[in-house]
A protein has these predicted regions:
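Positively charged n-region of N-terminal signal peptides that target proteins for export
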Residues: 1-4
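N-terminal hydrophobic alpha-helix used for membrane targeting or insertion
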Residues: 6-7, 214
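Bacterial N-terminal signal peptides
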Residues: 7-17
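Extracellular/surface-associated beta-sandwich interaction domains
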Residues: 22-778
């Protein structure tokens, strides 16, 4: 292996006391003030996420999930189905200055522009942020003029894509080159030129000569000199690799990278005049990352988005809200319902009937269509008030869950559900963060003020929890106060998700709505719904750093009523929430071994091994499951147990299909010789509505082997011998085992046992997606 770096040739609201609406019910006139502009051209970069079973188009200029050129939806799930669940999405943000002037940036369909590429200018030394050290809740980034030059908008009109596997590969290669380690170095291959270009071209630093913040995209600073230098082992920063855990989850405010594949970009709201909303600019710099994971469960049909929002301007904004807007069209756009789960901080869209018809040439989902949701995991920091604001917590002394009353929570700026905030009743003062505090909606075909917003003030009214004209939203019916109650509600269509009546500030509505309030119980006409999830109000100070993290979750039931797919989506969301709670440190099963095949006459010799890049190197895999096994007193580790090799029917069969005997069949298996052989998982069956036992492996329990002779075609009819000069396809997976407690659905004492004792590979030994290995006997 060469000892020199390939890098050498790369050359590389008003004041807090006011709560008025910004438009009255009969006032639709709005004249934006003249504001300075940087004359940046609109962003043009776009990218399609497609690492897992979702294909999602995103744009540098803030527009999400929309193919604007064709005016069609571009969030496809499952990938390759030609069926789409979301038409558009974007961030909204707004607040008022000391004079009551509204500042706002938002998008719907990007018919205009409120966002442009690139970082904004700052005055060095105005903040206290240092990414080398852990960062607490008093973090302030540099702020200043908050401007940008047009050439810098052009320079940053791009995405920076990186994969965790590439960073791991670079680390191992660098450490061997630098003499940090010699173990396994003979097996280490150099990163490709493309991989090195991505690492050396990582935008770790802004141009200080142009007034930009020196620290830009997150990077791992191996020698802690504050400078990004891959020659010294620095690289894009994933905090969950190679045994590292530098960022204390939930405490340290530094941002690292997440996901198996990550797309990072930076944009702002000061590049030019706001032509989408006509709002006055804030001076906001947004550092975004879109990421996903390849798995063999529901996470494979999820995507995630983290936004680090920095107020680079010198003005303080009051009554500020940050919001996630989503125009989710489940197949056919015209027949949807919307709703939310208050306790989860989850907004969702589902079909208004049990058949999603096609719309012209755009395919619907057909019978039992899915539901799509957006979980608002975390939002901005709540204003400091010198106390640890109340929220649900587990009392170790009494071993019970303690939940404050709605009255107590409202009086002390607390919460009553874990899913709508972070940092409450955790013993730490002033680290509380908002979750989803408003859920509003509108319909494209409705009359004003129940339809799309126009000027900035109408966007802001939806963010505050009001209709476009500033009129209130009510519990029941369509939320208009007609056909429902006269009780105000912060959340539209909560269903039965709010047993503590948080949305109505403690007023019990179960007498009027014994089955909860959703679109089905109100018999609403379905339509083209859009929704807004908001966090706030809070005070946005110069240099303030906030984060929004959201996840798009998908669920589909094979039978049941209108809410069946919503319930399936919520089950998926439980995994999404657990993944967020673990700071996206996903449980990684043992990597698939390297599979090589020797071709003989009417015979194939399949050989497996685990290079040093594998998490199962020397078959020593052991991984803690912090997502599904939450009891710290039990054994939470999965440990390597064995291998399985499958013959695939065709080259296009994926790892997700290995349980389908029409597509994949087991041809070889081995496992450690111990007391573990037959392993059964209990998996939820949508049709039956409960978990059923599924045999995952019937182990031969004869010890580990690394070569296997295959002489028969598992798919052959009649004569089964392998045919010379015919192509066959195989995949090998490793599996691990944990049974901290036996599970038995018939025994009340064992209902909290391990339902999933078996997990198998989701990625290759080198971090890439698992793909078939072909062989031709001859």
């Amino acid at each position: 292996m060469k000892k020199q770096f390939i890098a050498a040739f790369l050359g590389l609201t008003v004041a807090c006391t006011q709560a008025l609406a910004y438009l009255g019910p009969n006032d639709k006139d709005y004249k934006p003030t003249v504001k300075p502009k940087a004359n940046c051209s609109p962003a043009t970069a776009r990218l399609t996420m497609k690492f897992n079973d979702v294909s999602a188009l995103i744009e540098q200029g803030g527009s999400m999930f929309q193919n604007r050129a064709a005016s069609v939806a571009a969030y496809e799930v499952p990938k390759g189905s030609n069926r789409f669940a979301i038409f558009a999405g974007a961030l909204w943000m707004g607040g008022t200055d000391v004079n009551g002037q509204l500042k706002l940036a938002a998008l719907r369909y990007r018919s205009g522009n409120d966002f442009w590429p690139g970082p904004l200018t700052v005055t060095p030394g105005t903040g206290n942020f240092n990414p080398i050290n852990p960062v607490g809740d008093d973090a302030v980034r540099d702020f200043g003029e908050a401007n940008i030059d047009p050439d810098q908008c052009i320079a940053y009109d791009k995405f920076y894509t990186i994969r965790k596997a590439e960073v791991i590969k670079f680390n191992l290669w660098w450490e061997c080159n630098a003499g940090v380690t010699t173990e396994g170095c003979d097996e280490i291959t150099a990163p490709s030129n493309d991989e090195l270009n991505r690492i050396y071209g990582w935008p770790a630093h802004g141009d200080v000569s142009r007034g930009q913040d020196y620290f830009l995209a997150p990077f791992y600073d191996r020698d802690q000199d504050g400078n990004y230098n891959p020659d010294s082992g620095d690289h894009p920063w994933y905090d969950d690799i190679l045994g590292r855990d530098d960022i204390e989850c939930g405490i340290d405010r530094r941002i690292s990278l997440y996901g198996d594949e990550t797309h990072w970009w930076v944009f702002n709201d000061k590049g030019n005049i706001h032509t989408e909303t006509n709002g006055d600019p804030i001076g906001m710099e947004i550092r975004a990352q879109a990421f996903s994971f390849a798995t063999n469960d529901e996470v494979n049909r999820m995507t995630f988005y983290n936004y680090e929002l920095i107020n680079r301007g010198t003005q303080t904004l009051y009554n500020t809200y940050f919001s996630q807007y989503l125009d989710a069209d489940v197949g056919n756009y015209a027949d949807d319902y919307t709703g939310c789960d208050v306790s989860r901080g989850l907004g969702y869209m589902y079909n208004g009937d049990l058949i999603d018809e096609s719309d012209g040439g755009k395919l619907g989902y057909g019978e039992n269509p899915p539901a799509i949701g957006c979980d608002f995991f975390e939002g901005p920091y709540q204003d400091a008030d010198g106390i640890d604001n109340p929220g649900p917590f587990y009392d170790e002394a009494t071993q019970t869950e303690v939940v404050p009353t709605v009255v107590d929570a409202l009086a002390n700026n607390g919460i009553v559900y874990k899913g709508i905030g972070i940092g409450y009743s955790d013993g730490i003062i002033d680290n509380e963060r908002f979750g989803m505090r408003r859920f509003t909606y509108y319909t494209s075909t409705s009359a004003y003020p129940y339809n799309d917003p126009g000027p900035a003030a109408e966007y802001y009214n939806f963010m505050e929890g009001q209709w476009a004209n500033g009129s209130e939203m009510y519990y029941g019916g369509l939320g208009t106060g007609t056909g429902g109650s006269q009780t105000l509600s912060d959340y539209m269509f909560p269903g039965t998700s709010d047993p503590l009546h948080w949305s109505t500030q403690g007023e019990d509505m179960s007498g009027l709505y014994p089955n909860g309030w959703d679109e089905t119980t109100s018999n609403n006409p379905s339509g083209d719904r859009r929704f807004v999830q908001s966090a706030g109000p809070f005070t946005l100070r110069p240099g303030a750093v906030n984060n929004i993290t959201v996840g798009i979750v998908y669920g589909r039931s094979t039978e049941g009523g209108l809410m069946a797919s919503v319930e399936a989506m919520k089950r998926a969301d439980t995994k999404a929430q657990a993944l967020f709670d673990a700071c996206f440190k996903i449980l990684s099963p043992p990597d698939a071994p390297r599979l090589t095949i020797q071709e003989l006459e009417n015979e194939l010799i399949l050989m497996i091994d685990n290079p040093i890049s594998s998490n199962n190197y020397q078959e020593a895999y052991a991984e803690i499951d912090e997502i599904n096994i939450t009891d710290p007193t039990v054994d939470r580790f999965y440990r390597f147990e064995g291998y399985q090799i499958f013959q695939l029917k065709a080259q296009d069969v994926s790892i997700a299909d290995i349980a389908d005997p029409d597509k994949a069949r087991l041809v070889a298996q081995c496992d450690i010789k111990n007391n573990i052989s037959r392993i059964i998982n209990f998996q939820f069956d949508e049709a039956l509505g409960f978990s059923v036992p599924v045999e995952k492996v019937d182990g031969e329990n004869s010890g580990i082997r690394h070569s296997f002779s295959v002489k028969e075609d598992a798919f052959a009819q009649g004569a089964r011998a392998l045919v010379n000069h015919k192509t066959y396809y195989y995949v090998a997976v490793a599996y691990a085992y944990n049974q901290f407690k036996e599970y038995d659905p018939t025994d009340p004492l064992l209902l909290d046992g391990q339902k999933i004792p078996y997990i198998s590979s989701r990625l290759n030994y080198d971090g890439t997606a698992i793909s078939p290995t072909s062989a031709i006997p001859h």
